[in-house]
Regions:
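Membrane-embedded alpha-helical modules
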Residues: 1-79, 190-325, 334-335
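Hydrophobic, membrane-inserted alpha-helices
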Residues: 3-9, 108-112, 162-167, 227-228, ...
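Transmembrane alpha-helix interface/packing and boundary motifs in multi-pass membrane proteins
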Residues: 10-15, 110-121, 167-173, 251-260, ...
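Long, contiguous bundles of hydrophobic transmembrane helices that form the permeation core
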Residues: 26, 42-47, 73-100, 336-363, ...
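Alpha-helical transmembrane segments of multipass membrane proteins
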Residues: 32, 69, 119, 123, ...
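Helix-loop-helix hairpins and the membrane-proximal interhelical loops
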Residues: 45-148, 233, 250-256
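Hydrophobic, small-residue-rich transmembrane alpha-helices and their short perimembrane loops
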Residues: 103-198, 205-213
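Flexible extramembrane loops and terminal tails that flank transmembrane helices
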Residues: 318, 333, 338-441, 462-498
Length: 498
């Protein structure tokens, strides 16, 4: 129930579109259900593809939903990311903002500690839960998603406290909550140190050393960021189209390294297009990622609860209290006691609907069809493998029906000429990324990087050939150097393999 409550923070309590947030969270749960079921010997939604048996990697989902989608959107808008403003003189104001919103710092930190204690949740979900909580508690929401400092303070407070919370199960019970804690646990085992109650008795000094090292590292990291932030912020003055090739190459290379399979890039591009559509239609994307991250711990805890108590676990006092809290939170938003006054119903933290009424209705209908098809497919799974997808798809179907009604009744018409032009431009940039993938499949990552970078700069940016060649050489050289230093594998093309 704690995981479900976390989903509500990121889904129903994000912005003024609770149904869209809930649907996005259910989509994330459904994406996370792809692959081998942890509680039964069944492969779900794999379509006979070996790649999908282990599920879709988190890296591909995050880079697609946010990275690729934002790249396409920024390229379509054109220009630079930020205006030229004075930098390096806002540190004192930042301190004042933190002091002014000290309550957000405390609540965000507590959410982060809780996310760290629960295995499998981690910093990503904890940060978005904190963001959803801040948005839900704010009396005015118009500025969220547009630079409101409260939307930075809450998630960063949670992000900084997640690892601290992760120390509790890791050091006391040998149960890591995430990848960093697992690495720490492995290092302790390597030196013959057994985390657990005995460690508290025999190696208490080491525990305090770890805690102080973490605190000092955070302080030094913050100081370094303050020192470098003016120089790094000036990158936002550069026209984004000039930065895009290097960013795209980095994202493609990073996505491939998660499992070293081309399926990672396929998934990233597909989810990137989905993320762009969600942004244009004012669907919050954060709940989808949080739902995906929470799928594994939620299903594991559900399986354990059913295995131990049957369906009677729903009648336990703690579950009832959390369920009532969840229901009250949802009703609070849906009935408009807090949320409906300040943010239009069709608007979320992603902004207003851009593509118009008809695409919005069609997109919601597509979500309905996906949920219905997933529910029908789940009927063929064994009980323990089917209960979680059903728990995700049944609410999604009802919410999709309600959202279709809202979309049909909402005011709005066809998008304007400028919107249609930007949409066509965005699709053109997306197909450029697809072309990059095809080049990788044919010639391998190195040659494809050179061809894509030079072609993008020469075609889209209209950069002269000599600076474009120099830029291309730097990108390829840095990629080669990084691969050599870290021992990373380059995807090979069909032509080079023959």
């Amino acid at each position: 129930m704690l995981c479900v409550l976390g989903l509500s923070f990121a889904g129903f309590l994000t912005g003024g579109a609770p149904l869209k947030g809930g649907l996005a969270a259910c989509l994330g749960l459904l994406l996370g259900s792809v692959g081998s079921a942890p509680a039964d010997a069944v492969n779900r939604y794999t379509f006979d593809q070996l790649y999908l048996i282990d599920g879709i990697p988190l890296v591909g989902v995050a880079l697609g939903i946010f990275g690729i989608a934002e790249i396409i959107d920024l390229l379509a808008k054109g220009g630079q990311i930020a205006e030229r403003i004075g930098l390096g003189h806002g540190w004192l104001q930042g301190v004042k903002d933190v002091v002014q919103h000290w309550g957000i710092v405390v609540r965000g930190s507590l959410i982060g500690v809780w996310a760290g204690i629960l295995p499998g949740i981690g910093a990503t979900a904890g940060s978005w839960m904190a963001y959803g909580h801040v948005v839900a508690m704010a009396p005015d929401r118009e500025r969220f998603g547009k630079g409101d400092i409260r939307g930075v303070i809450g998630p960063e407070s949670a992000n900084n406290s997640v690892e601290a919370g992760d120390f509790i199960p890791t050091l006391l019970f040998s149960v890591p909550g995430g990848a960093p804690a697992a690495i720490l646990l492995g290092a302790l085992y390597f030196y013959g140190i057994q985390p657990g109650p005995r460690m508290v008795q025999e190696n208490l000094d080491l525990i305090f050393t770890i805690i102080w090292s973490f605190a000092i590292a955070n302080t030094m990291g913050a100081a370094l960021c303050l020192f470098l932030s003016p120089a790094l912020a000036r990158l936002t003055w550069i026209p984004f189209a000039r930065l895009a090739p290097a960013i795209v190459v980095t994202i493609f290379f990073g996505a491939f390294q998660s499992s070293q399979h081309f399926g990672d890039i396929y998934a990233m591009l597909g989810l990137g297009l989905l993320g762009w559509l969600m942004k244009q239609l004012a669907w919050p994307r954060a709940p989808l990622l949080v739902g995906f991250v929470l799928t594994k711990p939620t299903e594991q805890y559900l399986w354990l609860s059913i295995s131990r108590y049957g369906m009677e676990w729903l009648l336990r006092p703690g579950v009832i209290v959390l369920g009532l809290l969840l229901l009250a939170s949802i009703l609070w938003i849906v009935l408009g006691k807090r949320g409906g006054k300040n943010l239009p119903a069709e608007e979320s933290t992603e902004g207003a609907v851009i593509l118009g009424k008809v695409p919005s209705v069609l997109f919601t209908l597509s979500v309905f069809l996906v949920a219905a098809a997933a529910l029908y497919e789940a009927r063929s799974f064994p009980y323990l493998g089917a209960i979680f997808p059903m728990a995700a798809t049944i609410p999604a179907i009802f919410m999709a029906v309600a959202q279709v009604v809202l979309d049909v009744r909402a005011a709005g018409g066809a998008p304007g000429i400028e919107t249609r032009q930007k949409s066509k431009l965005a699709l053109g940039y997306f197909f450029s990324l697809v072309l990059f993938l095809l080049l990788i499949l044919l010639f391998g990552f190195g040659i494809a990087t050179a061809l894509f970078t030079f072609g993008f700069l020469n075609g889209w940016v209209k950069m002269r050939w000599f600076p474009a060649l120099l830029y291309t050489g730097v990108v390829v050289g840095l990629t080669v150097l990084l691969s050599w230093l870290l021992g990373l594998y380059w995807p090979q093309g069909i032509v080079l393999e023959q």
